[in-house]
Swiss-Prot record:
Catalytic reaction annotation: UDP-N-acetyl-alpha-D-muramoyl-L-alanine + D-glutamate + ATP = UDP-N-acetyl-alpha-D-muramoyl-L-alanyl-D-glutamate + ADP + phosphate + H(+)
Enzyme Commission numbers on file: 6.3.2.9
TM segment ranges: none
Binding-site list for ATP: 112-118
Pfam families hit by this protein: Mur_ligase_C, Mur_ligase_M, MurD-like_N
Class of enzymatic activity (EC top level): ligase
The keyword Metal-binding belongs to this UniProt entry's keyword annotation: no
Role of this protein: Cell wall formation. Catalyzes the addition of glutamate to the nucleotide precursor UDP-N-acetylmuramoyl-L-alanine (UMA).
Encoding gene, per UniProt annotation: murD
Protein name: UDP-N-acetylmuramoylalanine--D-glutamate ligase
Record's subcellular location: Cytoplasm
Matches recorded under InterPro entries: Mur-like_cat_sf (IPR036565), Mur_ligase_C (IPR004101), Mur_ligase_C_dom_sf (IPR036615), Mur_ligase_cen (IPR013221), MurD (IPR005762)
The species this protein was found in: Acinetobacter baylyi (strain ATCC 33305 / BD413 / ADP1)
Amino acid sequence: MLIQRGGLKVVAGLGISGVSAVNFLHEQGYRVAVTDSRETPPGHDQIPQDVQTSFGQLDTELLLQAEEIILSPGLAPQLPEIQQAIAQGIPVIGDIQVLRRATQVPIVAITGSNAKSTVTTLFGQMAKDAGKRVAVGGNLGRPGLDLLKDEPELLVLELSSFQLETTSHLNAEVAVILNMSEDHLDRHGDMLGYHQAKHRIFQGVKKVVYNRDDSLTRPLVPDSTPMQSFGLNAPDIKQYGVLREDDGTMWLARGRTRLIKSSELYIQGTHNIANALACLALGEAIGLPVESMLETLKQFKGLEHRCEYVKTVNDVRYYNDSKGTNVGATLAAIDGLGAAIEPKQGKVIVILGGQGKGQDFSLLRQSVEKYVKAAILIGEDAQQIEQALTETTQLVHASTLKDAVTQAQQYAQPEDVVLLSPACASFDMFKGYPDRGHQFVACVDALV
């Protein structure tokens, strides 16, 4: 229990994590107020009656009365109302910082531009299967503070750059940045700002896991901090990687020790091999038994909307990667599936487009040229993507997702893969990426 119950805690921004922070601080006996720019913010009816509320705009007066401001991850610290409070010396933190103060339970902290939900869920399952009392959440599923209700012995947290911006000295047991590619530059300004936010995950960390295929994931930490890497090449001693046989068999390995064939994983594609290796390294860091982890890998079916296998129609496999909302995620999906079907002369037909968030789509050129037979373009930034991919492959426009799926089917031949991985946000045509994914599945189900 925290001793001080003095000054006012002001939560800025409701939504899932804001509601969680209000309720947690209230239960702990703090004076709590909340402000949100929306007239009726989501969750306004899920907080205690005696919490002071100020909705319709961020209440500068209220913020300036705070002893501390708890900022929801959806709000940028750069907002003028928040900057005014910072200028007055008022600390601005996030719910993850509140969580760290409130518990001594070891934290496994996971971030990355892509694959963090898959790795967080898979690793949580590994810990559970190994008999740990584990709670999984953060940016995924349940907010961090709600996890304490489970009285866990281990916290597995997926953390976004927005959450890490307001977190210092997380002191994680082990932390990993899975990969780094352009994302959220509209919020962080440039790649450096994004990089700095992500690397806050390593403050006070006890052990580090990093991706040796991506130098931006390797932190500057004291030499005494144990570090272990994963990657898709042959690993050095005590590192995780891939050993390839002459017949094309791929083994996930630790040093020279072969652990499991890639074909034994339920989730396919080289990007998922990297995810599995990251989990094995995290598991070693907290002492999970190898045999148990390998068993979990054989069973884990992946997540909805994340390179999710939908069905096979006329010997063509359809994958829903609607969660691919940035270029890095789509690259991973195209490369992962493209490399897997290449030995059988299979090609990818990819559906791209939506709201591009100012990204550089030319980063897709090399992979599109290598693996993609046709790209079907949808959404408000289709034109921009077409310009970036000119002369790489067949580029076709579609006005609806249904039209895109129909066109994709016309290009596809046996052994090919049709992949929805838009590299864009979805709000121009859909309620969100789950809606886009469900509509894609419905379109595929309607194919004959």
